[in-house]
From Swiss-Prot:
NCBIfam families: PRK00104.1-2. Component of a cohesin-like complex composed of ScpA, ScpB and the Smc homodimer, in which ScpA and ScpB bind to the head domain of Smc. The presence of the three proteins is required for the association of the complex with DNA. This is Segregation and condensation protein A. Its main location: cytoplasm. It comes from the Bacteria. It is found in: Cytoplasm. Participates in chromosomal partition during cell division. May act via the formation of a condensin-like complex containing Smc and ScpB that pull DNA away from mid-cell into both cell halves. The gene is scpA. Gene3D superfamilies: 6.10.250.2410, Structural maintenance of chromosome 1. Chain E. InterPro entries: ScpA (IPR003768), ScpA-like_C (IPR023093). Belongs to the ScpA family. GO terms for cellular component: cytoplasm. Keywords: Cell cycle, Cell division, Chromosome partition, Cytoplasm.
Amino acid sequence: MDIKLKDFEGPLDLLLHLVSKYQVDIYDVPITEVIEQYLAYVATLQAMKLEVTGEYMVMASQLMLIKSRKLLPKVADNAELEDDLEQDLLSQIEEYRRFKLLGEKMSLQHDDRALYYSKPKLELVYEDAELLHDKSTIDLFLAFSKVIAKKQEEFSKSHTTIVRDEYKIEDMMEVVRQRCAGKSRLALQEIFAETKDMNEVITLFLATLELVKVQEVQVIQEENFGNIYLVGRGNE
């Protein structure tokens, strides 16, 4: 399965999505939390051996610099540089937001004008059918990053060293179906309760994403940053 960041037009688009979840002015967001979520998302993709393009890694480096400076003792010069870096980042996100809104407005105007022409509007079909059609799927990845961290700690304390490679997504899809069956909803972390190694954890998550993609499983998050639940088809 090929999972990429193509639903986001770049790292600023990803950051804008994270910032917008706070529902406050961009300059009022807790920037450290946003940075941690961005880094957790990218780290999760890397742990799953998925493609992360260079521009996302460049932004990750910049965010790590801002985060590291915020952890340093407050010195006048350092504090000023830290504020400059943070304000520059927020300004970039705000500028990107304005351009994106303008682009969406122009797109709507184009669609309105198309109604006045007899010639049928050309429909563009993109061949890249990506998994992340809904950007809220990023919340799944953010929740999964916590699962990975917990499981890595759990496995590191275990004396079991056998790692299997033969897990199949199709088999794990059936596991998720069975665990969702008969329940009104299932907390995401419950799916991974009995996993034995990291390969199983990752394959199980990919299976969950595939079930979401084919609409066999619905994702529910009742509030921003809240727990994520899975609802099987027929249990809505």
